[in-house]
């Protein structure tokens, strides 16, 4: 089936878009997306100093943002103004993204699962137009991720035993997360810098000692980050491997949830959920499902 041609008046030059056009990008997302990121969230995801994305298009009508990690390419955002959807701009943007990623050495393109700085863990199942676009370009559905929602008015009491990590713990936390969860390292450090990283430690733990061993009273047990890439969201969350299944993550999780409630949030959305049980125990329920799509480049 032939793709519809985009009218000349809606055929923008697919140029590089920079942080100076952040407000226009934000307004485009408001028109396009059911859960649009605000300017701060877009800036932190697309224009992070340590991992900037390549944003291409025209923020008045449509853009695509890409990133390369080794030989893997990722599309972090693709949106087209609803007024001109169906005229071929989405196809042009996706083709431009593939060309940019191929030029950067990518052998595959993935939509979703683009940690550490991401807006969505995939394509939400309600986004029929986006799913159709990807299928027409022969993208395969490779996995599903989901979020859970927690009503902060009904969470259990904070049991104590967790605190907000201090900036002075940077090196200890960096080493700890790099050893066990390297894919979450940058998100953890971003949360640390924002003051949104709850950690629990071995009894008598010193905030600066870190490490895995509790013999000296300083080992970290778990962490729970929130407000990392999107406001009102929870994650990543992790428990020291030797303590998995022993309830060691409850203190950090509940401390983070109570801090979110104190900050004025009515609900928390847990992103890209792994195990369901820890969040179900504090009232969480699955509320959104996202598909991850991938295509290998020729």
Annotate each predicted stretch with a short phrase.
Residues 2-42, 145-146, 155-185:
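Short amphipathic alpha-helix that is part of the acyltransferase structural core
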Residues 3-10, 202-217:
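Intrinsically disordered, low-complexity terminal tails and inter-domain linkers enriched
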Residues 75-85, 114-116, 237-245, 274:
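A short, internal acetyl-CoA/4′-phosphopantetheine-binding micro-motif in the GNAT/acyltransferase core
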Residues 36-54, 62-72, 181-203, 216-241:
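A conserved beta-strand-loop-helix scaffold within acyl/acetyltransferase catalytic domains
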Residues 75, 109-112, 234, 268-272:
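Conserved hydrophobic beta-strand within the GNAT/NAT acetyltransferase core sheet
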Residues 86-99, 103, 239, 245-258, ...:
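Conserved acetyl-CoA-binding loop-helix of GNAT-fold acetyltransferases
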Residues 1-10, 94-160, 291-296:
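Acyl-donor-binding surface of acyltransferase catalytic domains
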